[in-house]
């Protein structure tokens, strides 16, 4: 399978026209003979890519005071918890924020407020924030998320996930694609790409 994936990546690189931006690589996976109407059969996995995503991941954190300064030091955008209620009342602004960031983190005391006011926007996009305990440095979580991609099938038999960018080498892209393939095949036995 590794050779097939490597050949597919090579073919995509050779056949792609020249662009004025750094292209991402996506893998399309089609499931066969799987009933996705049953939520147990759906795939929802976070895969840590061995060679990273090839692009910077945008992370935001709902935090105040001390945790906010730690987050800023780690390069994480900080959203003031006082604005959560205002964002919840302005759906357009909340959607814009959800589109702007790849992952969200939150201090534990703010999780309920985020769920109440922004859950309608963040939940369906799979972007509900991960809780950060007060003893944990948000930089550790952010470093892990920099090389993480989400594989989510929902109720569709064909789904896509990003696994790298044009700036990465063939071996890095192949390793990333194989990591996703291995994780998905461990969840299901009947898969065709």
Residue spans for each PLM region:
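Extracellular/luminal Protease-associated
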Residues: 47-109
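Residue-level preference for alpha-helix termini and adjacent loops
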Residues: 24-30, 42, 46-48, 78, ...
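Long, charge-patterned amphipathic alpha-helical coiled-coil/hairpin "stalk" segments used as oligomerization
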Residues: 83-187
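Translation machinery proteins
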Residues: 15-67, 90-91
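OB-fold/S1-family RNA-binding modules
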Residues: 1
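Conserved small/polar residues in nucleotide/adenosyl-binding loops
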Residues: 191-193
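Interdomain regulatory linker/hinge segments that flank or connect interaction modules
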Residues: 7-15
